[in-house]
């Protein structure tokens, strides 16, 4: 019985050590991947197309606003055959950003009152 108990404790110890090593490896891989994604996003942010500028060359190059990414919207001007594309923010996202800003301001006032 002592042998089985000793073997069980040894097995649990080895298993916990190996799982801790695997978790450390996964954490390091996730951290490296996250850093590379952040670097790519920063590089892309420098090349983005500002709001109301032409985005016909790359329809996914629109800049981000505070919360949401602008959308490349294409249309045909009246009396013209050429398609015009510009980066624009959809109205519903604009209203959502305004609501979030007002909620932040209200939260700041509450902190002043009770904080």
From Swiss-Prot:
InterPro entries xrefs: Spider_toxin_CSTX_knottin, Spider_toxin_CSTX_Knottin_CS
Propeptide stretches in the record: 21-44
Main localization category: secreted
Protein name in UniProt: U3-lycotoxin-Ls1f
Cellular location(s): Secreted
Family assignment from sequence similarity: Belongs to the neurotoxin 19 (CSTX) family. 01 subfamily.
The UniProt record lists the keyword Secreted: yes
Organism for this UniProt entry: Lycosa singoriensis (Wolf spider)
Superkingdom of the source species: Eukaryota
